[in-house]
Amino acid sequence: MAFVASVPVFANASGLKTEAKVCQKPALKNSFFRGEEVTSRSFFASQAVSAKPATTFEVDTTIRAQAVDAKKKGDIPLNLFRPANPYIGKCIYNERIVGEGAPGETKHIIFTHEGKVPYLEGQSIGIIPPGTDKDGKPHKLRLYSIASTRHGDFGDDKTVSLSVKRLEYTDANGNLVKGVCSNYLCDLKPGDEVMITGPVGTTMLMPEDQSATIIMLATGTGIAPFRSFLRRMFEETHADYKFNGLAWLFLGVPTSSTLLYREELEKMQKANPNNFRLDYAISREQTDSKGEKMYIQNRIAEYANEFWNMIQKPNTFVYMCGLRGMEDGIQQCMEDIAKANGTTWDAVVKGLKKEKRWHVETY
């Protein structure tokens, strides 16, 4: 998932580069990937056809968690690495995560950063593809939402994961056009180096309230930040964080074969039925009560009263991530719900934004 954006500079970012403290490694509960148990980097090494020997990916038992308490300190890691001086990470895993016959290809990619690029759930990193554009200038960085918790997929604070869909389309002249960065990333092999910038972003950070209701609206690779949310909530055990609220994910995709992390999500939901609700909107396979294609807004409409009542509560937070086209349908749905409750959505969403309870990142 990629979008190009200007990156603002925030104060207090550099402190996280030098401050490090030893903490207990987070215990991973029910850790799995593509339905299999995951305990260390060696799992990913064994899954990747071109992976180097597992010894290359041994987990260091001394954990440095630079970003763990960032929000409590009032510090959010931002712009630690810039385009002029990126961090050089390495790909250690790159595998397809869509089913057979899926339209398009999406990969789960893991990079090492050896604790040098701390980040928080909801942030993004920049990737600079090698080479130059048609004008001979270096390629611009692309931003990708992070799909792993701050501790990475192995809980050792040394990796960062992305969900990347390969961009390919035919233009008006019948020429095949390939996205520069997405194709570069999807073609990486374990051991390949990659230029990383960031982290960036404060819009999609998780709320600190551990009893909050968190509603997540995602399409396609927009699932990335919510995978990081959910893994922090339900797969890691922390002395200072225990989620006991409600997480409700609406995931919109065209076909069942494009449900990213399906086994992972359903396993978490089954293990946490009182704290995690999961609803799919599969547009090419499902219809609503009116016989219309099932998009996220159609699924939300089925829970209109419940959804409305939830967002009236001060500890309910709504997050939206995915293709920009999802916004119009959800906007219309919310306007209809607000009207049925005697008000306007413009007034409601204005209040939600003021209270920092409505968060949108689309591309």
Curated annotation (Swiss-Prot):
Which major enzyme category is it? oxidoreductase
Source organism, top-level taxon? Eukaryota
Q: Which GO terms describe its cellular component?
A: cyanelle stroma; cyanelle thylakoid membrane
Sorted UniProt keywords: Cyanelle, Electron transport, FAD, Flavoprotein, Membrane, NADP, Oxidoreductase, Photosynthesis, Plastid, Thylakoid, Transit peptide, Transport
One Pfam family name is NAD_binding_1
Residues engaged in binding FAD: R142, L143, Y144, S145, S163, V164, K165, Y169, V180, C181, S182, T221
- State its location(s): Plastid, Cyanelle stroma; Plastid, Cyanelle thylakoid membrane
Outline the extent of the FAD-binding FR-type domain.
84-206
Q: What PANTHER family does the database record attribute to this sequence? A: PTHR43314
Q: What is this protein's record name?
A: Ferredoxin--NADP reductase, cyanelle
* Species name: Cyanophora paradoxa
